[in-house]
Every structure is written in structure tokens, then in C-alpha cells.
């Protein structure tokens, strides 16, 4: 039986989602609970592997079990055993061929920035502080340039190992908030550190050090040395996982380009 679990977590005290040889991770917390319940190791499969310090409003993982436990009981048992910085929002059964990673057709991230005369210690780890004056309109114009299908080689970590760095962005915008701004970006998928590099670049645009019309050339050049800065992880939130094309179409229209991942478990 395959179980799908929806969770949220604050990433401050985690070394990321994926299990590490040493250190606290989200995967480690759940696999420890499942091992205790099953009396053997049970691997979980996430929709996304967030990095150290990154938060999630919505994240999914699935696992296989032989235990006959009601979904509400799964939720109760996990939440009772979990630390306060992780919460199980929902548990449900899925088809045996469903796979969290391969059936994920899109993700939305939100990056939070606050501004002011000084840092707020109560926002430490959850939002990023920028004290310079920023031109939000100019930043939003630059953000719009990223919408569409592009090769984002120049806007990701040089450690990125995937073969294709082509991704499609359906949404890329600056949203003004009471104390600063949020950068909201939705796409077919994201490369290592891609959102944080985009944010760092947009902040440079806001400071007047870059221009919106720099974007097409930077995308074409595919050179990370031309976009050297990376924003800290503190303000980054995985906000939504799209597990069906219908969800994406409902929000962004029927003409969008959807990238389907081949599920290895179906073959």
C-alpha cells in the first residue's frame, strides 16, 4: 500500500530534506518514526529536496507499507512523535504507480525579504534583510523576463549536475509587502540554488547595479561568473507542489508548456 504524506516545516534547524551521514534532516525524522513502527527501515520519496535552512509550506513524500493503519491515525502518530518544527498536514492513499518525484509537474517558491533601518532579530532565519533602497517596479520588470522556457545554466550553482538545465517558468514576480517584498516564482522545476541566484540578481537590479534588459543576454551567455551572487536560504519557502497538470492549467491557463517526468516505477 502506498501512502502520500503532506507536510510543512521550518528549515532553520535542518541540514536540508535529504538524509545526511551526520546532522538533522527532515527525511531522517520521518524514517526514524517509520522504522520504529515497522520494525525495519522504510524509505520515503519526496517531491522536492530542499536545501539547508529552506522552509516548506507544502511538501509531499510517499512510502510503501504493509501496515493496515487508518490515514488519520498515521497523521496522529507522526505528529505526536515529530518535533515542533515539522507538521503533518494530511495523509492519503495513492495508486501503487504514483511517485512523488516523477508525478510532480511543477513547484512554487516564495522568497521573503524585509527592509528597514536595522535587522529584526525575531525575523532571523525566516526572512532576509536588505537595508538599501530598492526599485520594486524595475525588479518586477526584470523578473518578468525569466517567464518562459530558458536554459538557466547562468542562474544556478556550478555544482548542479543535471544534464539539462532548461526549465519553464510560469510565474516570476515581485510582490510588495508591508515591510519589504516577496519574490514568487512557479516553474516546471528548479536547479540547485536557482531561486536564490534569481533573487540575488533581482536585488542587484533593485539597487541599480543591473538592468532588466540584461536578462536575455545573461540567459544566452550561460555563464554563472556573470551572475556571481547567491541570496541566503533564510527567506526561501517551498510554497506549493503541483502533482497534476490540471492544477497548473487551472492557475496558468491551458496553453502553458507542461513538462512530464517519466515514472521509472511504471516500467
From Swiss-Prot:
It catalyses: uridine(38/39/40) in tRNA = pseudouridine(38/39/40) in tRNA. It holds the Pfam family PseudoU_synth_1. Gene3D superfamilies: Pseudouridine synthase I, catalytic domain, C-terminal subdomain, Pseudouridine synthase I, catalytic domain, N-terminal subdomain. Signal peptide: none annotated. Its EC number is 5.4.99.12. Keywords: Isomerase, tRNA processing. It comes from the Bacteria. NCBIfam families: hisT_truA (TIGR00071). Formation of pseudouridine at positions 38, 39 and 40 in the anticodon stem and loop of transfer RNAs. Homodimer. This is tRNA pseudouridine synthase A. The gene is truA.
Amino acid at each position: 500500500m502506498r501512502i502520500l504524506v503532506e507536510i510543512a516545516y521550518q528549515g532553520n534547524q535542518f541540514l536540508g530534506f535529504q538524509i545526511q551521514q551526520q546532522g538533522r534532516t527532515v527525511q531522517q525524522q520521518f524514517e526514524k518514526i517509520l522504522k520504529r513502527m515497522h520494525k525495519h527501515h522504510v524509505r520515503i520519496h519526496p517531491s522536492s529536496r530542499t536545501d539547508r535552512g529552506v522552509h516548506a509550506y507544502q511538501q509531499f513524500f510517499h512510502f510503501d507499507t504493509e501496515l493496515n493503519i487508518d490515514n488519520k491515525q498515521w497523521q496522529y502518530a507522526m505528529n505526536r512523535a515529530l518535533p515542533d518544527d515539522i507538521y503533518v498536514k494530511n495523509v492519503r492513499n495513492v495508486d501503487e504507480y504514483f511517485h512523488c518525484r516523477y508525478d510532480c509537474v511543477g513547484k512554487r517558491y516564495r522568497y521573503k525579504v524585509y527592509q528597514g533601518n536595522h535587522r529584526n532579530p525575531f525575523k532571523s532565519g525566516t526572512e532576509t534583510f536588505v537595508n538599501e533602497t530598492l526599485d520594486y517596479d524595475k525588479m518586477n520588470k526584470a523578473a518578468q523576463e525569466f517567464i518562459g522556457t530558458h536554459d538557466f545554466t547562468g542562474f544556478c550553482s556550478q555544482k548542479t549536475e543535471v544534464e539539462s538545465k532548461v526549465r519553464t517558468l510560469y510565474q516570476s514576480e515581485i510582490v510588495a509587502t508591508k515591510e519589504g517584498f516577496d519574490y514568487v516564482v512557479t516553474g516546471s522545476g528548479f536547479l540547485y540554488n536557482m531561486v536564490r541566484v534569481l533573487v540575488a540578481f533581482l536585488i542587484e537590479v533593485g539597487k541599480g547595479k543591473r538592468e532588466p534588459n540584461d536578462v536575455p543576454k545573461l540567459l544566452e551567455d550561460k555563464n554563472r561568473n556573470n551572475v556571481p551572487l547567491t541570496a541566503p536560504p533564510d527567506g526561501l519557502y517551498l510554497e506549493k507542489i503541483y502533482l497534476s497538470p490540471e492544477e497548473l492549467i487551472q492557475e496558468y491557463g491551458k496553453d502553458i508548456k507542461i513538462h512530464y517526468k517519466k515514472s521509472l516505477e511504471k516500467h
